[in-house]
Amino acid sequence: MVDHLGLIITAAVGAANCPERDGLEALFFLRPRGQKLPAKVIADQGYCGEDMKIRAKRYGVEVETVKRREAKGFVIEPKRWIVERTFAWFGKFRRLSKDYELVTSTSLSMMYLVMIRLMCKRVSQMV
């Protein structure tokens, strides 16, 4: 889960056979104690449906799904590019460019380390 700048709010790494819908609920449940969830989460069509809205409502979160446009060819989807940009940032780091890790907690730690590095670089450019 990322904010509007593409910075990680919280993350979870799971098995490939786990549906993304279950992963979103895991993010809500496994967040650090005291961390507030955003009031609204923007997601793609994989998270649409009443079941997902009810599951998110338990945590006080509204799920808004971004509908795909019917246009042919390459179309930039509103808001969805924010998450895709974060994945592109991760792809620049060798340990996250492929799934090298055997343990999911190591992959998660690498994601957080890369995000810390990116944020420090951004802050140093501001000074």
What function would you assign to each model-found segment?
Residues 54-55, 59-63, 73-127:
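Basic, amphipathic alpha-helical segments enriched in Lys/Arg and hydrophobic/aromatic residues
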